[in-house]
Amino acid sequence: PICTDRVVASDIEHPNDHTAPSEPTITFVEDTNPKDGKLNKAENSSDGDNANTTAKISIPTDAVVGDVIKYTVNGGAEESHTITNADKTAGHVEIKVPVTDGQTSSVTAKIVDQAGNASKEVSGSIDVDTTAPKVDVETVTPVDTNNPADGNPDKGIVKGHSDEPNAPVVVTDKDGKIIGTGTTDDKGNFEITTDPIKPGDKVNVEVTDKAGNKGNGEGTAGDIEHPNDHTAPSEPTIT
């Protein structure tokens, strides 16, 4: 009888390759408006998935098809992704990262080549803030500054409060035109001087937090005030 032995080749060994690949970079693709390391509600909603955001792990130029990206998400178990031709062409891979309002989401990543050499591990994180500020408009006052008063408002004063201190405030009229700007104080209070407004005019007050979330409140102008008119009218005559 003739006996035939079959030998199956094992994986290629690389005994002389001791060079680690370059490290990747990590970016969060929804962090765009503004790009500040914070994820606001509008950014997180841009792809319709409010439970996750997308992280992009770059593929360095010296990484090749068959090398492995090892990564973790939010401190979880290490996962592996073998680089494909499509990945190499794109120059990156994308992974889903769960997000929770008020918490920080994080990713670590490194490249391991086919000789087992590992790049430096890099990390990236994003602070998640998807809660808009609360805005309470307390008074909207037309002001006639003339002495004597002529009944025509020269400006408006809008007062209120937000739960966001030291934040920009924008006041607009019913048509969306900006009529005043300012900032909340360290307790969240604001007093904004505006263009002239009349009794009954409606205004919108928008407060933007540090993550870019926008909160809104509305108010209606009351009666005209005349703070500078201290002149008594002439007395009448009686006949």
Language-model segments: residues:
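Glycine-centered loop-to-beta-strand initiation motif
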Residues: K88-V93, T184-I192
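Flexible, low-complexity linkers/stalks enriched in Thr/Pro that connect modular domains
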Residues: D5-D31, D113, S123-E138, D144, ...
